[in-house]
């Protein structure tokens, strides 16, 4: 008999960080849906304001609080749930669940853990317990020993024998893990590894050099029935974190014996931890014989399970939630197929490729080599019917300016064979580009295998693409058969046109004349063997007919956000999903085009039709040819839609909302600056970078510092503050590289100004706007800034002038839909610095803070007009809301932590409060590794900017109970100083509770900042924020823990 709980608490994962991203928005949303179907009341704790999950429609009650045990205890005390789900919020949620269990909170309030129990979680996540469990069950694991101290680690590594893989228990994204080739390597890094473990434990394991890494996804119910859902093959060998690896599904190089043996072991691993729900099991396979080891398991929804779910069409998170409620596999219907029960193992008639997306160029000093720690910030997934087609599509999806395996910047560079092999040996990101270059320059398969350990099967495929492309280049014209073969191998129109030295339009014309167009295929989990009710599709040239009939009517295609990177994250998926829902009121059919496996928008039951495919002019035009969409919406998915808007419009596509020509004016720095001059709106002095002579003259006239700003970029890519001529010339060179087709603008950088923004919606005549004020001064990228609603320091007069400016721009550009305007305010003058004619990164926050969905309002503005009498309307604020940035410094090996005009954060959290400090502190505490400092500990406060704020910060921290030191080389008035060496020593000894600093001081304090983030010590990189947070510490006892609607927020 199944006992259904009446109220269930679901723990989210908090803000997006490297290794814990939007996959938990997807999995948590599915879990909440599964609970709702059962009539169960749901309560969600999650501080990630950007997610779809933290919209009211998913959970009955939402608490936007730090995802830590003491905050969750307050919710349990108030809500009294019967059950708790901790398997849908990543490692963060599991850690909270274990803490609540150990501290007796679950027992005290009689809350039952649903799904895999705590002892099973501990068996899986403690490296020592996992090893013991596997050995007890006669399951093969590599030779290894655990350790809980530096001395024990050094002793046990000698027993295991070098090289050793250091694995970290209860850990996220391999943080702190490494391969130690010698004792010296181990001694240098073992303290950091132990610091990154939630329980202070590591495993020293024999390093399996160049072994193949594989993952299996398994479902298991309370009766022990199991179904293996996917086998995923990592192309990168052991030693590269699976989140950093290019992977394919189904596995391509296993024989039946290998596949079946590991499948059996997977089921045994699930049984040994008494899994209820879903887990993934990772294996190492000897490429030269039938020898395999079990490496680890994650007893929760994970990045891999999100990928497996999207790759197979099997709704893992939904089914897992049902199993946690006590269902058996045969009782749950697979909602994607609509025909089969959850015990059916999927069958695939296509190949899926996942490639991670890195943004390492944004960080100074970061280690560029891929290793055991995850550094990628997002991923893409492509679907094709040949490996070549799937791989080339995935490379284009990365949006890194490469058209596929061949024909791009790397392939056409002057790099020699030796240089390409060197990059491959160093494990640089996007290895397939260097492999293709090496083959082009004459490298053999064996030479590339020796430096990479990548299976020869895949290397042969890449070499085949190189050979085909070189043959293509020798042709003057292309015949129908060669063109069809090229398309089947995944070549884009752009690649083919480059090879033939023709235009893209020429290739498209021949394609249409020869009827060489892709066909639409369904993902149904059943390889077409059973009829299915799915709406989940992709396009391929390896097919002869479409799997669907295309409907007529008033139809909308929404362009998704693509793969996440710094600057494009889950907030744009929120916009896409909001637009889907709003659009269904105005269109007969709404479809979405996206290729991110982590997101809610690519879930099977969100869109009427989901096209899991490339976002490009070529693909959109192909889809319009088939589907006859009346409109295409490019404004909800971040920069990627805006980048193709103008070209789509030039090809006859009707854009929803603001015109492509208006978007071009906003995105092109020179055109936008001229528009502001025409309207008489204040902006910093500027010049378009046409010659070095003019730039030099301008800089001398306005004085340094100046800001270098490329066009059509996101997250401040290559945006730099230049303090000298030398820096100016270097930054202009970089900016023209990143955005060569568009002008680079140099403007006067206004120091010590307040930065503010308006998120808004217009119908071309009226404006609905929300004002956000930054705590940090102008010069810190808005994506890294802490934001407050309502504003605090701006005067009403300034805000009214900002609103007036916005209204004038909206009317001049005939803005129809969402937009965001950024201002700097100095001496009572607001200066406009940027306009984005699309949904903004802050829109989920501003919408939830005010209780009004700006994307829904956008659709009303476009079709019905805004329905208020004023020209400009801002909804009133009922309470305070504060948004904080989440940084992932600890994952980015070697990176120097500092803030500037280029974005560095990976996610965001928000909280609400009855006072500004109530909201600020909960918001700040929601970002890892921030915590309330232990009184009687040490704080370091120093810097070369915002010195008055740093001094006041030091005073506040002293009042809080900390011993505060400044550094003698950068003293603060009346604050005790220590020298730099002593400061480093205190940080390494983990005696420092918090660091507050400001300014770019890499030559001086690199070791202090880097060691702090390696050891999980909270660090605040701005004096103004440090002051406000330190003041909030003094009000710690008055924090409130209300449900979001009690603060008047939520949508």
From Swiss-Prot:
Which top-rank group of organisms is this from?
A: Archaea
- Pathway(s) per entry: Amino-acid biosynthesis; L-arginine biosynthesis; carbamoyl phosphate from bicarbonate: step 1/1; Pyrimidine metabolism; UMP biosynthesis via de novo pathway; (S)-dihydroorotate from bicarbonate: step 1/3
Region span, Carbamoyl phosphate synthetic domain: 549-930
Q: Give the reactions, separated by semicolons, that this protein catalyses.
A: hydrogencarbonate + L-glutamine + 2 ATP + H2O = carbamoyl phosphate + L-glutamate + 2 ADP + phosphate + 2 H(+)
How is its cofactor bound, per UniProt? Binds 4 Mg(2+) or Mn(2+) ions per subunit.
Give the cofactors, semicolon-separated.
Answer: Mg(2+); Mn(2+)
Sites where the protein binds Mn(2+) 3: 822, 834
Sorted alphabetically, which HAMAP family does this protein's record hold? CPSase_L_chain_A
Name of the protein: Carbamoyl phosphate synthase large chain
Organism field? Saccharolobus solfataricus (strain ATCC 35092 / DSM 1617 / JCM 11322 / P2) (Sulfolobus solfataricus)
């Amino acid at each position: 008999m199944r006992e259904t709980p009446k109220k269930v608490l679901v723990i989210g994962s908090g803000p997006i960080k490297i290794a814990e991203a939007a996959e938990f928005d997807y999995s948590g949303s599915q879990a909440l849906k599964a609970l709702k179907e059962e009539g169960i009341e749901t309560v969600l704790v999650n501080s990630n304001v950007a997610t779809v999950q933290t919209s009211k429609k998913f959970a009955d009650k939402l608490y936007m609080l730090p995802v830590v045990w003491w905050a969750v205890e307050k919710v349990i005390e108030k809500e009294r749930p019967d059950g708790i789900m901790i398997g849908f919020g990543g490692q963060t949620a599991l850690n909270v669940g274990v803490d609540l269990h150990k501290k007796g909170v679950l027992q005290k309030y009689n809350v039952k853990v649903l799904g895999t129990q705590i002892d099973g979680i501990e068996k899986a996540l403690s490296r020592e317990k996992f090893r013991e469990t596997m050995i007890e069950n006669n399951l093969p694991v590599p030779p290894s020993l655990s350790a809980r101290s530096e001395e024990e680690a050094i002793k046990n590594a000698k027993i295991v024998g070098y090289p050793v893989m250091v694995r970290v228990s209860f850990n996220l994204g391999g943080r702190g893990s490494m391969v130690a080739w010698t004792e010296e390597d181990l001694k240098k890094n073992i303290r950091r590894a132990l610091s990154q473990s939630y329980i202070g434990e590591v495993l020293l394991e024999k390093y399996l050099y160049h072994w193949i890494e594989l993952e299996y996804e398994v479902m298991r119910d309370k009766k022990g029935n199991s179904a293996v859902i996917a086998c995923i093959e990592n192309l990168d060998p052991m030693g590269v974190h699976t989140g950093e690896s290019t992977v394919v599904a189904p596995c391509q190089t296993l024989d039946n014996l290998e596949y079946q043996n590991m499948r059996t072991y997977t089921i045994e691993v699930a049984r040994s931890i008494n899994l209820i729900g879903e887990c993934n099991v990772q294996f190492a396979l000897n490429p030269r014989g039938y020898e395999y080891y079990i490496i680890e398991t994650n007893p929760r929804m994970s990045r891999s399970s999100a990928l497996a779910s999207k790759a197979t069409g099997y709704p893992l998170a939904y089914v897992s939630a049902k199993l946690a409620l006590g269902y058996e596999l045969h009782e749950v219907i697979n909602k994607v197929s609509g025909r089969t029960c959850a015990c059916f193992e999927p069958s695939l008639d296509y190949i899926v490729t996942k490639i991670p997306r890195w943004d390492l160029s944004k960080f100074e000093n970061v280690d560029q080599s891929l290793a055991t720690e995850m550094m990628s910030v997002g991923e893409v997934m492509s679907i094709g019917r040949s490996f070549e087609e799937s791989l080339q599509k995935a490379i284009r999806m990365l949006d890194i300016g490469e058209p596929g395996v061949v024909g791009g910047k790397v392939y056409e560079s002057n790099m020699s064979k030796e240089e390409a092999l060197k990059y491959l040996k160093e494990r640089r990101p996007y290895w397939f580009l260097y492999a293709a270059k090496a083959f082009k320059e004459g490298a053999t398969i064996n030479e590339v295998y020796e430096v990479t350990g990548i299976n020869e099967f895949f290397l042969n495929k890449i070499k085949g693409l190189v050979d085909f492309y070189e043959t293509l280049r020798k042709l003057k014209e292309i015949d129908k058969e060669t063109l069809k073969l090229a398309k089947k191998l995944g070549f884009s129109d752009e690649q083919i046109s480059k090879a033939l030295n023709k235009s893209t339009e020429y290739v498209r014309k021949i394609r249409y004349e020869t009827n060489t167009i892709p066909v639409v295929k369904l993902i149904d989990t059943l390889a077409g063997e059973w009829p299915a009710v799915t709406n989940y599709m992709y396009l391929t040239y390896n097919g002869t007919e479409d799997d669907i009939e295309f409907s007529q009517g008033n139809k909308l295609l929404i362009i998704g956000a693509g793969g996440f990177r710094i600057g494009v994250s889950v907030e744009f998926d929120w916009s896409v999903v909001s637009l889907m829902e709003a659009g269904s009121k105005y269109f007969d059919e709404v479809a979405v085009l996206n290729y991110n496996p982590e997101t809610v928008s690519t879930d099977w039951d969100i869109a009427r039709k989901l096209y899991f495919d490339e976002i490009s002019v070529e693909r959109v035009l192909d889809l319009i040819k088939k589907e006859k969409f009346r409109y295409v919406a490019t404004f909800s998915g971040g920069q990627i839609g805006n980048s193709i808007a103008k070209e789509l419009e030039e090809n006859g596509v009707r854009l929803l909302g603001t015109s492509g020509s208006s978007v071009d004016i906003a995105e092109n720095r020179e055109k936008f600056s001229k528009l502001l001059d025409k309207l008489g709106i204040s902006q910093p002095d500027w010049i378009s970078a046409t010659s070095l002579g003019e730039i030099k003259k301008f800089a001398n006239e306005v004085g340094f510092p100046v800001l270098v700003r490329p066009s059509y970029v996101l997250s401040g890519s290559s945006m730099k503050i230049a303090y000298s001529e030398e820096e100016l010339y270097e930054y202009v060179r970089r900016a023209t590289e990143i955005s060569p087709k568009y002008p680079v603008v140099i403007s006067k950088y206004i120091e010590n100004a307040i930065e503010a923004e308006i998120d808004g919606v217009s119908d071309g005549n009226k404006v609905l706007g929300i004002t956000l004020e930054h705590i940090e001064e102008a010069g810190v990228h808005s994506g890294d800034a802490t934001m407050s609603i309502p504003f605090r320091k701006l005067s009403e007069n300034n805000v009214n002038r900002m609103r007036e400016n916005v209204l004038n721009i909206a009317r001049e550009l005939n803005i129809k839909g969402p937009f965001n305007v950024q201002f700097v305010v100095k001496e009572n003058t607001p200066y406009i610095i940027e306009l984005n004619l699309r949904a903004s990164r802050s829109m989920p926050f501003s919408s939830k803070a005010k209780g009004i969905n700006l994307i829904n309002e956008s659709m009303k503005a476009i079709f019905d007009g805004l329905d208020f009498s004023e020209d400009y309307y801002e909804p009133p604020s009922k309470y305070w809301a504060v948004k904080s940035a989440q940084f992932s410094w600890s994952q980015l090996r070697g990176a120097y932590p500092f803030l500037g005009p280029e974005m560095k954060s990976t996610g965001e959290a928000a909280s609400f409060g009855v006072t500004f400090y109530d909201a600020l502190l909960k918001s700040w505490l929601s970002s890892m590794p921030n915590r309330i400092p232990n009184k009687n500990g040490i704080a370091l406060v120093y810097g070369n900017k915002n010195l008055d704020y740093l001094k006041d910060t030091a005073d506040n921290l002293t009042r809080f109970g900390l011993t505060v030191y400044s550094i003698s080389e950068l003293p603060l008035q009346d604050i005790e100083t220590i020298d730099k060496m002593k400061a480093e020593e205190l940080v390494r000894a983990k005696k420092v509770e918090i660091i507050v600093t400001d300014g770019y001081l890499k030559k001086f304090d690199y070791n202090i900042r880097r060691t702090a983030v390696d050891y999980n010590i909270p660090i605040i990189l701005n004096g103004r924020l440090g002051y406000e947070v330190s003041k909030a510490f003094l009000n710690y006892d008055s924090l409130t823990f209300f449900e979001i609607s009690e603060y008047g927020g939520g949508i």
